[in-house]
Amino acid sequence: MERLRRTMMFVPGANAAMLRDAPLFGADSIMFDLEDSVSLKEKDTSRALVHFALKTFDYSSVETVVRVNGFDSCGALDIEAVVLAGVNVIRLPKTETAQDIIDVEAVIERVERENSIEVGRTRMMAAIESAEGVLNAREIAKASKRLIGIALGAEDYVTNMKTRRYPDGQELFFARSMILHAARAAGIAAIDTVYSDVNNTEGFQNEVRMIKQLGFDGKSVINPRQIPLVNEIYTPTKKEIDHAKQVIWAIREAESKGSGVISLNGKMVDKPIVERAERVIALATAAGVLSEEDI
């Protein structure tokens, strides 16, 4: 079954209550943050807290992600702690080159081997947050088989570009396009950046519709209120599901007749239409709005 990554919810690593309650939020992925949301004096405590949470609480209903610090800080300690605790994905901040991925993977693999953990169990995600990273997105996306996705980090990116965030998001168009194309070429997920104005519901929904139209798999979120809004937009509608089912039935009918020609309502059905229908079915099934018996 396809892994849903419609929503990736940031949870501050220093917030014990949110760590405990994270599975209740309804996000597809929960990202415990040990980087920007944690002050220097709280780094060690937060690392221990996230390790404890991963070992203690039941996160089986969600994908667990930890955003670690860079190697210029305490990144190696973060990686070791969360790999030992069984995290699903490590998110690298401020990734600029493929070598950044290779360096982090080496630490992950060392920890896995030294502790008899299945090598390759811990996956990776790269956050791209600078002009250098955007221009190297293709190489970054193909740097490791552990990579499940790349994500845009807009706040650092716009600062690096000597601009700021605007409501229409035009300042992010090139970065989004580069990251999306790199992800698709590598066969991994593309996750959009956060929308920081949690009180602007209309603006948030418009941005989610736009990034879905571009082709992103999902969006990072910073407030539980944003989760159902994203999930609803990214979940196939009844109309989309019904059309996809008709395409699948048309394929089966053609196969039963031994025909290589597929038609629906008098129109030819070509490979891209079939692939889109199969993806709609996969997403709807993963989201729980369609059962295999209904197909």
Give the predicted meaning of each segment.
Residues 1-295:
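Expand to "…catalyze enediolate/carbanion chemistry for C-C bond making/breaking, isomerization
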